[in-house]
Curated annotation (Swiss-Prot):
Signal peptide: none
PANTHER family listed in its UniProt record: DEGV DOMAIN-CONTAINING PROTEIN DR_1986-RELATED (PTHR33434), FATTY ACID-BINDING PROTEIN TM_1468 (PTHR33434:SF2)
Species the sequence originates in: Xanthomonas axonopodis pv. citri (strain 306)
Entries under InterPro entries matching the protein: DegV, DegV_C, DegV_domain_contain
UniProt protein name: DegV domain-containing protein XAC3508
Lineage: Bacteria, Pseudomonadati, Pseudomonadota, Gammaproteobacteria, Lysobacterales
Amino acid sequence: MRIGIVVDSACDLPQDFIQRHNIVVLPISVRIGEAVLADHRDEEATLSFLQAHVAERGHEAETTPFSVNQIRDLFLQQLVIDYDHVFCLTISKLRSQIFDNAMQASFAILNDYKPIRQAAGHTSPFALRVIDTLNLFAGQGITAVEAARLRDQGQSVAVIRTRLEQLAEHTYGYMIPRDLYYLRARARTKGDRSVGLIGAALGSALDIKPVLRAYRGVTEPVAKLKGFEPSAEKLFGFTVRKIRDGLMTPTVCVGYGGELAELHALPGYAALQGACQTHGVELLESVMSLTGMVNVGKGALAVGFAAEPHAFSA
């Protein structure tokens, strides 16, 4: 049984991890003025687009997910031949059209694949499962890493599916934006109310940073802390405590809206690296997706892991 894993480009995972595990990326296109980039999780392309466009006018960006037809074509031209079963893991459907597009495409794919597979010499049926990760950015990485791990172990499709659906319900994605004015301007552009309870002007004047949590599809502020670096340190410290308590998978994903050297220099990051090493947890760090950056702003920090239900505490 050849099992394929598909994610959308909002999923924060390192480029080499994606390549090593043959993870297929559905690109999300970002348009800022006349500049357009289809995000294929290329960190250099993301950083140069960030310098050129996102920092100044990112809040005006329009993001376009892969359409129903594009998803159908990708599957029928490639994936129904390369794989027997595909897991398609998407950003929370409350945040993007991708889940709905993939679901819609799946009906056409399952209708039309047989002659294509037969021509390629495969007589067995093809199946796919679209799973809402109920999360975003670094949080999305957790289910994808687990899918790759279970596939490498030779687990069955049924075992993998059950595990991923359970994991999605227990994945936490924490984020700290660096610039509240940006966040408010972006929310206004999108008509998004989820950051409404933050007074951006007041927050910026007092250097207050919200800690946003994505959990079971919902994104909301769970704390307000002072200063970006102290806030990052508190989030790393909280993650270390969760690692010591025991995570549900041996993985922590970190996404950063800029050069990774800046992430490494943040207070508390070395302690997080040490805790991961001590407890046998894989720390996967990546430049945040372009979609992530235009939505939460340059220099934002995101941390994802799976754990039993808990409240955030600084």
